[in-house]
Regions:
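Conserved catalytic core of sirtuin-type NAD+-dependent deacylases
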Residues: 1-241
Length: 241
């Protein structure tokens, strides 16, 4: 199966990668929906409640306590999947990474064209004056983080439940998928909409799914591999001419 994947990659000139939480689990970042992910851990409120715009507005101290504890992951490094995708971009084969992750690991690996559908924990801004702050400012603050310049609340640039996706990011992602000759879907269960709905714009030659569990794209895929994506993309395969 990996040999078939490498053959598809070698024949492609416009690859787009669409990824989710499973891409970063090998970097030590938990998958929200896996058996041992955030959705199966015990809190006073379910994560989808805490990570909502309403909760952020009404219970900001609890929101930021959870956010610092569970969403800011210190010391995470790009894994083999991130590094291989960045390499494919440098080689000119991969044109874009579309990610549902908020950890910035694709950019840390060297990827340049990355559409972050759900934003990034690395960017934070004052809701009052617009001043920008890095992740360390949030991590090192206590209680509700406040802007030193104006006193406004500093909000992570992540898409919370009840919030819409960024239109420019969406547009760029759709355009990339429409132009792709190969779409590789990796580390995502394809259950979060509207993000998962973007794959319907693909009209290219090869659809590949690399995910530990079945997805609703499997039936249309040319190739499905049920292995950790870092393992798959790091395997050395020599293709016969």
């Amino acid at each position: 199966m990996v040999e078939k994947l490498e053959r598809i990659i070698s024949q492609s000139q416009n690859i787009v990668f669409f990824g989710g939480a499973g891409v970063s689990t090998e970097s030590g970042i938990p998958d929200f929906r896996s058996v041992d992910g955030l959705y199966h851990q015990k809190y006073d409120y379910p994560p989808e409640t805490i990570l909502s715009h309403t909760f952020w507005e009404e219970r900001p101290e609890e929101f930021y306590r959870f956010y610092r504890d569970k969403l800011i992951v210190k010391g995470a490094k790009p894994n083999a999947a991130h590094l291989r995708l960045a390499k494919l971009e440098r080689e000119g084969r991969l044109k874009a990474v579309i990610t549902q992750n908020i950890d910035g690991l694709h950019q840390a690996a060297g990827s340049k064209t990355v559409y972050e559908l759900h934003g990034s924990t690395l960017r934070n801004y004052c809701v009052k004056c617009g001043a920008v702050y890095d992740v360390d400012f949030i991590a090192n603050s206590t209680g509700v983080p406040r802007c030193p310049k104006c006193g406004g609340i500093i909000k992570p640039d992540v898409v919370l439940y009840e919030e819409g996706l960024d239109e420019q990011v969406l547009s760029g992602a759709v355009s990339a998928i429409r132009r792709a000759d190969t779409l590789i879907i990796g580390g995502t269960s394809l259950v979060v909409y509207p993000a998962a709905g973007l794959i319907r714009y693909f009209r290219g030659d090869h659809l590949v799914v690399i995910n530990m569990q079945p997805t609703n794209a499997d039936a249309e895929a040319d190739l499905c591999i049920a292995k950790p994506i870092g393992q798959v993309l790091s395997e050395d395969v020599v293709l016969d001419d």
